[in-house]
């Protein structure tokens, strides 16, 4: 598919022309009906309503201006996003502000992007209007309630330009290691990345299955936006959507939708696979079959090998194929998708020598009983688009040497909104002494540590999250995975400096269990002993402090990533309310 002369609006018009009566998006509302109330739109309805919203927006500004979308999960969010693009504006997808709580992130993004309009719905307009303030002398954005527009009125569709070669939307990063920045995603980026991912997941274009996209992911998040709105449009698929809250309240709903949507494709972070295993009963799955699930992407956060195994084992009796589970690596700066294992392959893991890994060398464990770290493979990426580079020298690393993952291609986005210096540092990297087949640049510096071993990509974590304890490098994701296998809850491994060096501290969310205070204390002591022993055995590390806290205490981003720097600050200021204070 040529991507240089296509845009999201042109594809939407094409779908409306070629498949006017085919269902495009279905939203299942479990809030109004516990059994799920389904509401659907055809491609012609989506196109006509997006055009009406675009007409309304043209009264607010000019193409290239920003339009924020602050609406609940649902069809109105889909229409608002596509309407902004239809008018040639730059969409800014955001979450709805929490009721009764000032949302600093929403305020910061609106101040940075300076939208001329905010698209919302009547159900939340009271909360949204509070954020419609003027910034730097510019007029306050116009608030448009999408559901109150006459979206069904028959009218001649206006002639919009089919060429939208510039920015489509700003995807604000979750800010796990820095202040959120707006990633500028172009129409070309979207179409290229969806196309790349389809080829990556299914190989031969002729083998790309028709079917349905199933998603509960928030539409303001990069994976939810691409999966729930853009992929159905680019890949000619129907989408079945529900809200994140509907999933969290009853994870079995996700599995039931997968079993009843025919040939379908979905995606979720690691924690969702764990929730589905723990909270989907045999009764929930009675009479259901998952044999038609062609793919479930696991991405957006560190993938735990044990979780993948539990998920496959839990749903094997319902004919879920192991090859349907697709571990994937990506980031917003590359639109979404970067790498995944080859089509038809079940998830593969390799156990690497831990001591060598802390020294930056990836050597598979032998049979000598050495302590190993099990990592999941992300397949064999195209060398022209993915390289492992020494972040200090900018020279490509040989296979087996850990370095920074660099990415190149049409899916690499345009940079950070209004941040030229940061854009140059991250998006315009050049290889020193590149190999004959490698382009010199520009390369995207992902900030992620990875390695190519036996031709396959393995990922360790973020460079900025690297723990240096006793003069050795340690990967917090590995330590957290060890803890979570014991406690089952969220954990944060952080390095806290003392007068001489840095010490390992683990913050562990734990649900108090026990009918008496004495039983609770005994359980907490037992957990601390077990975690301390496991970290010592698996990582050759001494834990300076284990902090047991209630669920929800660890700071996270809007996409669920641990804010480790915030954990350090909170720990040093005694900001965590410890369950183990008397242990």
UniProtKB/Swiss-Prot annotation:
Recorded phenotype for the gene knockout or disruption: Disruption of the gene abolishes the production of phthiocerol dimycocerosate (DIM A) and of phthiodiolone dimycocerosate (DIM B). Mutant can still produce mycoside B.
Entry's EC annotation: 6.2.1.59
Record CDD domains: FAAL (cd05931)
GO cellular component: plasma membrane
Recorded metabolic or biological pathway in which this protein acts: Lipid metabolism; fatty acid biosynthesis
Family: Belongs to the ATP-dependent AMP-binding enzyme family.
Annotated protein name in UniProt: Long-chain-fatty-acid--AMP ligase FadD26
Taxonomic source organism: Mycobacterium bovis (strain ATCC BAA-935 / AF2122/97)
Name of encoding gene: fadD26
